[in-house]
Amino acid sequence: ARRERARLRLGDGESGDLMALLDREGLKVYRPQFPEGTPLEGIFLFDAEAGPILVVDGRLTPLEADFVFARLYAHYLVDNDPYVIHLLVRGAEASAQDLRAQSFAAAFLVPAEGLAAYFEALKWVPGTALDAPTALQLAAYFEVGYRTLLARLLTLNLVQPDEIPPLLIVLEAGGEPDAGGRERNAISERFLRLALEAHARKFLDDRALA
């Protein structure tokens, strides 16, 4: 995750809109609304003509979608097998590949170096109980959901498992962190621009554009 962040020149702070980032990398990314009530959150597959495709449920909040996109990106980087389709299903037992993807996603979205710098600025000492206001600041700074943040802190031994449930109750009672202007677009801005340009040049009619 650290090497990939360095390659993308993301620094030690927030990663920004993952859908837009992966789109700039040339990946096919989509956020259609999945059927209501489905536990399916994301799909990674490889198409012979289109290449790697990452699909995330458009019903997820933007920050939840970022975490799913990051997990799918991990499968793209490590498990890019044209004969395997990866389904991210909420509540399903995680395979070794899924656990690795979750760890990558948390590390990619919340870099250890950025955390260390932030804690140093706060003069927070590891081993001290993390309070809700500090967790709220961290989630806002890295632009991640509370569960993503706490999962990352847990892997770095900065919080203990028994600290997480009461923190989540307080944090989630106040609503999701700010999404940094992310929108719930079903297709990427790049594909939208291409479609509009094709329509303007008469390569697509009104029905095809719709």
Regions found by a protein language model. Name each.
Residues 1-210:
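Active-site hotspot residues in diverse enzymes, especially metal/ion-binding acidic/histidine motifs
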